[in-house]
Amino acid sequence: MPGDLNLKKSWHPGLHKNQAVVHAKEQEALEERRRIQERQKEIKQQRERDELQKLQEMATGKKRVQKVEWMYQDPTAVGSQQAFNEKKVDANSTDDYLLGKRRIDSIVKQKGDLEAFDDSLDRFQPKTDKSESAGIVHKVKDDPMVAVRQKGRELGYTDEANESERRSRRERSRSRERERRRPRRKREDSRDRRNRRDMEREGERRRRRRDGERTRRRERNRDPSPSVSDDDRGYRQSSREERDRKSSREEGGRSRSRDRYRNRSRERYRDRSREERSRDRSRERLRSRRDRDRDRDRDRDRDRDRDNVQSSGRSSGRSSVRSSARSERSLRDRSRSRDPDRDRDYRSRSRERDSGGGQGSDLSDEVGNGRSVLDERSTDMNASDGNSSHGYRADNEFSPSRSPVTRSHRDKRNSYRPEYKDEDDKRFAQRKDKEKEMNALPKGLQQMRAKLLASKKTTTVSGTSQTPTSAPSGSQRTPSAASGSSPTGKAATDAKLSDRLARLKAMQEDAKALEEERDERLASKTKHEEAERLRDALLRQKSAHLGRSEFAREEERKDLK
């Protein structure tokens, strides 16, 4: 049968390693217990001594002052009554011995050699109890700093030696650093000087070469002398060129290393200057962009302020007519861009108007009546629904606000009756508040409201468009009948709209109730989970405290109950 595989495990108690660890722990525990017993024994002895001293004080009636009496436990101390009573020692004798006024030779001559010397030694040594000395020894042994110093002494280290070694190491590193810095500066200075010298020499050489070439060219351009032949001139020129080539080759071989270093330094300078230039360029670009944006914002604010001042300063005339026409046109374009269904309705109405153009003056009367009705209805709709000022009334083709005469009349009215303008501002503020309330609704409710408003506008527009085409002859329908039919349609649309808004509010309340119910369910669920968690923790704690068998028995008893 194979051996026990558990012996392969590091935690197995049969291993010698684990047994040695257990033995060491047991020995430590025994040593600690022995120390505790010794300390308890010392405390007991001290208590007995204190009790005896208390009994002595009670018998004699003299109380012992326990402040600094440990300093006077030596019988040879100055003023010690025990010394005077037992050994009859002079009070100043110990001080004289310590100060060198008296000598020990007389004591040695009077008594025996060893006995007298031992007696003198006993005088100067403080007498302490064995228990106190043992406690001090134990404290010294347990002190970790004493152990560290002892170890250092054994190894031959001392604090002073370590400090001196550290200081010398620091000095060496500083001197090394100084030595490293000095020659580098010298080398750099000498290298710069050498480079400057080489550059000056090179420039001088080039200048000389240029001057020589110029003089040679001048001599060549002059008339050749009859005594000098072409061959001699060519030989001289070729030998001169060879000499120049040789000298340039030698100089190039000598200065190649210098040129290499010079090129490197120039490239480094070029790279650095290129980086600085690019950095400056980017800074300038950012600064110019910031200035441009600031100027643009300033101009825009100035133009806006000027427009506001001009629009508020205009009270009448062509300027007011033009500004109102421009604002109406912009509002109309904005509203058309917002709602494409209105453009469709406008096209259908224009087609119907073109098709019924042959009916004459009767049709124009009907159109006038419809114009007044639609103007009233559009104003009521804008006031009740909370639409913006550039809403249905601005898009209505029958609205009188599109005529310049009406606009100028309104501007004049606002100029000499400012309360009308205040009322318009109040109405506009109310509309804005309603728009904010509607925007605060959820997205689904906003979409449903937009659909309802669109359906309402289509119904009103279709009702107005049927008025001119339904009458075959304009003489049969009267303006009173047309004006009488409009309030009923308005009331019906208002009732529908209020009904749908009530439905929307009910849906919103239902959604809020559902959200609250969901939050309550989540809170109750978290509470139940927390209670279950606490119960499990308590059961686990109880089972660990009682033991598995007793806990199971208690659970069975609960189940039986």
Swiss-Prot record:
<comment type="function">
    <text>Involved in pre-mRNA splicing.</text>
</comment>
<feature type="coiled-coil region">
    <location>
        <begin position="19"/>
        <end position="65"/>
    </location>
</feature>
<feature type="compositionally biased region" description="Low complexity">
    <location>
        <begin position="311"/>
        <end position="324"/>
    </location>
</feature>
<feature type="compositionally biased region" description="Basic and acidic residues">
    <location>
        <begin position="547"/>
        <end position="561"/>
    </location>
</feature>
<feature type="region of interest" description="Disordered">
    <location>
        <begin position="1"/>
        <end position="21"/>
    </location>
</feature>
<keyword id="KW-0539">Nucleus</keyword>
<comment type="similarity">
    <text>Belongs to the CWC25 family.</text>
</comment>
<feature type="compositionally biased region" description="Polar residues">
    <location>
        <begin position="380"/>
        <end position="390"/>
    </location>
</feature>
<feature type="compositionally biased region" description="Low complexity">
    <location>
        <begin position="455"/>
        <end position="470"/>
    </location>
</feature>
<keyword id="KW-0747">Spliceosome</keyword>
<feature type="compositionally biased region" description="Polar residues">
    <location>
        <begin position="471"/>
        <end position="488"/>
    </location>
</feature>
<comment type="subunit">
    <text>Associated with the spliceosome.</text>
</comment>
<dbReference type="InterPro" id="IPR019339">
    <property type="entry name" value="CIR_N_dom"/>
</dbReference>
<feature type="compositionally biased region" description="Basic and acidic residues">
    <location>
        <begin position="230"/>
        <end position="308"/>
    </location>
</feature>
<feature type="coiled-coil region">
    <location>
        <begin position="326"/>
        <end position="389"/>
    </location>
</feature>
<dbReference type="Pfam" id="PF10197">
    <property type="entry name" value="Cir_N"/>
</dbReference>
<feature type="compositionally biased region" description="Basic and acidic residues">
    <location>
        <begin position="163"/>
        <end position="223"/>
    </location>
</feature>
<feature type="region of interest" description="Disordered">
    <location>
        <begin position="122"/>
        <end position="561"/>
    </location>
</feature>
<dbReference type="GO" id="GO:0000398">
    <property type="term" value="P:mRNA splicing, via spliceosome"/>
</dbReference>
<protein>
    <recommendedName>
        <fullName>Pre-mRNA-splicing factor CWC25</fullName>
    </recommendedName>
</protein>
<keyword id="KW-0508">mRNA splicing</keyword>
<feature type="compositionally biased region" description="Basic and acidic residues">
    <location>
        <begin position="496"/>
        <end position="539"/>
    </location>
</feature>
<dbReference type="InterPro" id="IPR022209">
    <property type="entry name" value="CWC25"/>
</dbReference>
<dbReference type="InterPro" id="IPR051376">
    <property type="entry name" value="CWC25_splicing_factor"/>
</dbReference>
<dbReference type="Pfam" id="PF12542">
    <property type="entry name" value="CWC25"/>
</dbReference>
<dbReference type="GO" id="GO:0005684">
    <property type="term" value="C:U2-type spliceosomal complex"/>
</dbReference>
<feature type="compositionally biased region" description="Basic and acidic residues">
    <location>
        <begin position="413"/>
        <end position="438"/>
    </location>
</feature>
<feature type="compositionally biased region" description="Basic and acidic residues">
    <location>
        <begin position="325"/>
        <end position="355"/>
    </location>
</feature>
<keyword id="KW-0175">Coiled coil</keyword>
<keyword id="KW-0507">mRNA processing</keyword>
<feature type="compositionally biased region" description="Basic and acidic residues">
    <location>
        <begin position="122"/>
        <end position="132"/>
    </location>
</feature>
